[in-house]
């Protein structure tokens, strides 16, 4: 293959990868939003005054 042909194939691969990544990126944004809407276990345990996670364990008792 000549240099022009190799460059053309390279451009096609780059453009195809870019076009395919846009729809999957927006789908992952929706999943991120859904995950943020649900409250985490760590947050729930903070509301009850208990937390066994190392990040909040120094502020709350584990309750075990």
Swiss-Prot record:
The modification Cysteine amide is found at residue 62. The modification Deamidated asparagine is found at residue 48. It holds the Pfam family Toxin_8. It comes from the Eukaryota. It is found in: Secreted. Residues 22-47 form a propeptide. GO terms for cellular component: extracellular region; host cell postsynaptic membrane. The keyword Acyltransferase does not apply. Transmembrane segments: none annotated. Residues 1-21 form the signal peptide. Keywords: Acetylcholine receptor inhibiting toxin, Amidation, Disulfide bond, Ion channel impairing toxin, Neurotoxin, Postsynaptic neurotoxin, Secreted, Signal, Toxin. Disulfide bonds join 51-56, 52-62. Expressed by the venom duct. One of its GO terms (molecular function) is toxin activity. Found in injectable (milked) (IV) venom. The cysteine framework is I (CC-C-C). Alpha3/5 pattern. Alpha-conotoxins act on postsynaptic membranes, they bind to the nicotinic acetylcholine receptors (nAChR) and thus inhibit them. Belongs to the conotoxin A superfamily. This is Alpha-conotoxin CnIC.
């Amino acid at each position: 293959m000549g240099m022009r042909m190799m460059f053309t194939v390279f451009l096609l691969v780059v453009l195809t990868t870019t076009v395919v990544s846009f729809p999957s990126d927006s789908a992952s944004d929706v999943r991120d939003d859904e995950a943020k809407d649900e409250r985490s276990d760590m947050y729930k345990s903070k509301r009850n005054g208990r937390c066994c996670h190392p990040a909040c364990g120094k502020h709350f008792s584990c309750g075990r």
